[in-house]
A protein has these predicted regions:
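A short, ordered amphipathic alpha-helix with a cationic face
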Residues: 4-8, 52-54, 89-90
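Amphipathic alpha-helical interaction elements
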Residues: 19, 23, 69-70, 94
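Basic, short loop/linker segments at the boundary and entry of helix-turn-helix/winged-helix-like folds
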Residues: 24-65
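Short helix-loop boundary/capping segments at the starts of domains
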Residues: 36-44, 69-73, 84-91
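Anion-binding and metal-coordination hotspots
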Residues: 3-6, 64, 71-84, 95-510
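Hydrophobic alpha-helical membrane-insertion signals
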Residues: 1-29
């Protein structure tokens, strides 16, 4: 057996192109093409004027997106990849941005990154990958960048705040003492030696950014004022909350929300919230979808039982949206789980009466019971039997009836194959199981980057499927072009009817 010849010297007569060393089927070329099509003119005003030239935001954006696709999210790892990884060297155009540059760009451009996510939705829609026949919403908890050791009560934080004040006072006094000690210059000690001496003394002290810690204490106390239900707050990230994940483990998390189109699993809306449940997230998600893309009149909106809230169902009916959200017992039945006990009454829609064990109860009043949400009170004629039901129980009954039909069951069963695989892809294929940036705004920013990467990969895969029929498409275009007598304006009109990623391949035929 002989071995393949290798070349340890690795010398080339002529330097090879980095692009040629990457597979022509690599997704990085699609990332490059997409980012190059974005508008970066707003950054020109930021970077204009005197000073050291800045890295073009186009380059940093390519690095961040490719990093998410390659499961490399840390700014330090991305900076290292720009020196060691051929794909990143190619996308970085042979420059090597510092990790601080990457982290600073990511931190300071949340609005721009959100607009880029909208661009991916528009791109998918323009290429026929989104039809909005059905959208599915679901939530998933993702671990925050915070430690349980810093999860403190309000009294503990206030006590810590007072301790920090004393430490700052001591530091001020120590600085005055240092000035007296180091200010008296001796003949045998030079300025450099005094500077070294200061460093030695400083190394023996406990070094902490007390001002930053004090600011965190202030933010943590503000969170108690915003949310009266919480008893503890994380000092390192006051906006995250203690939540129970699917494994039954309590950890500091953020609740992420995804709304996915059924045709190609394109994410059309996302969000991050501090709520422990998904109950109040349906309306914000639908509003987010409307900001990104226009909903059809007959769009089916599917969500699990966690979104079955009276206000949500009322909202769907008022907006004339076709919702499919089961009750807890219906969801358990569809999932072959032990069912929760159902209500034991019937409802007469014509007379607005409840039938309980053969006795008819008439509507009496709409009241609040012990400070809870408003309830509808039904009472028998003799006043001996009273039944309280939720204010929007009729909307619940209509939704329940819809989910009991054969069509309703079939539509709801598709939810698992639409939105849940998307969450699984983001968490496990992209490695997005924990936030790196702290704060709610930082979490939203990171989720947008993950959604951009997911959508681009879906479009790239669809590009491969379209590519199988390219010969037929090109043949049809040549015929149309000949019929147009090669008029340049007609060529442009022709190109607008096909996906942008096929333009380069087709232009040389026209």
């Amino acid at each position: 057996m002989t071995y393949i010849n290798s070349y340890k010297g690795q010398d080339w007569l002529l330097p090879t192109s980095i692009k040629q060393m990457i597979s022509d089927k690599h997704i990085c070329f699609f990332v490059e093409e997409f980012v190059d099509s974005l508008d970066f003119t707003n950054f020109d005003m930021i970077y204009e004027g005197a000073g050291h030239p800045a890295y073009h935001p186009r380059i940093i954006m390519k690095i961040i997106i490719q990093g998410m696709l390659s499961k490399e999210r840390s700014s330090r790892k991305l900076s290292g990849a720009c020196r060691e990884n051929l794909v990143f060297i190619y996308l970085a155009e042979k420059v090597q941005p510092n990790f601080r540059t990457i982290a600073r760009f990511r931190k300071n451009n949340g609005k721009f990154i959100k607009e880029v996510f909208k661009e991916t939705v528009d791109l998918a829609s323009d290429n026929g990958l989104v039809d909005l026949n059905m959208i599915c919403t679901d939530g998933s908890k993702i671990k925050a960048n915070s430690s349980k050791k810093m999860f403190l009560k309000k009294e503990q934080i206030e006590r810590l705040d007072s301790i920090i004040d004393k430490m700052i006072e001591e530091d001020i006094k120590q600085d005055e003492i240092d000035k007296e000690i180091y200010g008296e210059k001796e003949e045998n000690i030079t300025d450099i030696e005094i500077k070294n001496l200061k460093g030695i003394v400083k190394s023996y002290r406990e070094i902490k950014n007390k001002e930053k810690l004090k600011e965190n204490c202030k933010r943590a106390v503000e969170e108690f004022d915003k949310d009266a239900l919480i008893k503890r707050v994380s000092l390192s990230d006051p906006e995250c909350r203690m939540m129970k994940n699917k494994k039954g483990v309590f950890e500091l998390d953020y609740n992420t929300q995804f709304t996915v189109d059924s045709k190609n699993q394109i994410i059309v809306a996302n969000d991050v919230c501090k709520d422990r449940t998904d109950t109040f997230q349906l309306q914000p998600q639908i509003n987010n979808v409307r900001e990104n893309i226009t909903l059809n009149e007959d769009t089916k909106i599917v969500a699990d039982c966690n979104y079955n809230n009276g206000e949500n169902l009322k909202f769907l009916e008022e907006e004339k949206l076709n919702g499919y959200i089961p009750t807890i017992s219906q969801a358990q039945k569809l999932d072959d789980k032990k069912q929760k006990k159902e209500d034991d009454y019937e409802y007469d829609w014509d007379k607005d009466e409840i039938i309980l064990d053969g006795t008819r109860l008439k509507f009496h009043a709409l009241w609040k019971h012990r400070g809870n949400k408003r309830q509808r009170w039904y009472k028998s004629e003799d006043g001996r039997i009273v039944r309280r039901v939720p204010e929007f129980f009729r909307e619940r009954l209509r939704m329940k009836k819809k989910l009991e039909t054969k069509e309703g069951k079939k539509i709801y069963s598709l939810r698992k194959t639409i939105v849940e695989p998307v969450i699984g892809n983001i968490k496990y294929n992209l490695g997005f199981t924990e936030f790196l940036v702290r704060g709610l705004d930082g979490a939203k920013l990171e989720l947008n980057i993950a959604s951009i990467s997911h959508n681009l990969k879906k479009i790239w895969v669809a590009r491969g499927r379209i590519g199988k029929n390219n010969e037929v498409i090109v043949f049809d275009l040549i015929i149309k072009n000949n019929q147009m007598n090669c008029d340049p304006t007609c060529k442009n009109k022709l190109l607008t009817n096909i996906p942008f990623f096929m333009h380069k391949q087709i232009k040389h035929y026209l």
